[in-house]
C-alpha cells in the first residue's frame, strides 16, 4: 500500500513538472494573462494615494508627452502613506534636450497642487496620469489586434531579468483624447513589463507615425 501511495505521488509530481515545462512563455495567451493580471491592479485607479494598497513601500509614476518640438515629463514619487506625494513637471526641447520650463507639484488629499497652476495647465493640460482613467485587463487586450510580441528570458536579457513586449492596434478613447485624435480611431499601443524580481515595473506607450508620443511608467519601490 505504501509503495502504491508513493507511486501515485511520484506520478503526480511528474505530471506537474511536465505541465510547467510545457508552458509557452512567448504565447499571446500567456503574456496577456500576465500583463492583464498585473495592469488591472493599477489601471484604473482614480485616487493615486490608493496605490499604497498595492505598493505599501511606495511607488513612482512617470509620464512623457511629445507635442511638436517639446517633450513634457511629469514625475511623482510616493514614499510614505499619509504624506504628500511630490514631483516635478518639466518641459524639454525635443531636439536639444535643453530644459525650458520646470515646476514642482504635489498630490495631497486626492488632488494635485501646482507651484503655478496656470502654467501647469499649459504644460500638462490633461492634468492626470493615464492610469487614473484608463482601464486595462486581459479581456481588453485579448480583443485588440496584436501587431507583435516578444519575450526575453533572464539569460538573454542585458538587465538580467525576464521581460516582455506587446504591441497592439486598439481603441482607447482616454488615450485618444490626450493625443487629440478621434476617439473611434485605433492607435498603436505598446506594453513593456518585467518579472517579479524587480517588483511591479510596467510601461505603456502610444505611437504616432512610429514615434512614441505618449508614455507612462509605474514602478514599485522595494526595500
Indicate residue ranges for each PLM-predicted region:
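Sec-dependent bacterial lipoprotein signal peptides
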Residues: 1-22
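An acidic-aromatic
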Residues: 75-131
